[in-house]
Amino acid sequence: LIRAYLGLGGNVGDRQGALEQALSLLVCRPGIRLVRLSSLYETEPVEASGGWFFNSVAEVETSLGPDELLTTLGQVEGACGRPRLRERGEARLVDLDLLLYGSRIIAEPQLQVPHPRMHLRRFVLVPLAELDPGLVHPGLGTRVSDLLAHLSQLPEVRVVAREWCVARAAERSVP
């Protein structure tokens, strides 16, 4: 099994409800088991339109390959009502990103892992550091906590809820 980290976000409608739905659908899929889930954070939009985002990071174990996992994330986004074709920067009901896939570095047209901008985004690094501050970014060789320490304190990232998702009960999902 591979340990992967997934970014979850959304800034349209019932943001928490949409992320809970996405996570519930995700952990019901064969080959994905939720290990841990960060707190739920509210963040100002960065390079996106619409209202403030709710963001979280899920640590999962998966037997899926990186391409399969990315496809699954897209299927879950679609099941939650996100259109397949969308403009960069538009408001998002649900946005699921593959941040890290073990220690693999993947550079393909449709898949870049680690996520190419994760080290620049507080809304990714704050919840990721909550889960594992000593986690090392495979491409940069730097701990997540150190990456976070070198970023500006803006935009603000604030905790909305520590225990927020009913899908935590699904942490027992079997790959």
Protein language model features and the residues they cover:
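Extreme N-terminal starter segment of soluble prokaryotic enzymes
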Residues: 1-6
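Conserved beta-strand segments that form the floor/walls of ligand-binding pockets within enzyme
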Residues: 7, 36, 59, 95, ...
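A short secondary-structure junction motif
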Residues: 10-12, 46
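Residue-level signal for inorganic ion chemistry
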Residues: 11, 37, 127
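Short N-terminal binding/cap micro-motifs at the start of the first secondary-structure element
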Residues: 14-16
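Hydrophobic side chains in well-ordered alpha-helices
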Residues: 18, 22, 69-72
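Short, surface-exposed acidic-centric catalytic microdomains
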Residues: 21, 25-66
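Flexible, gly/pro- and Lys/Arg-enriched active-site loops
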Residues: 45-53, 64-70, 74-175
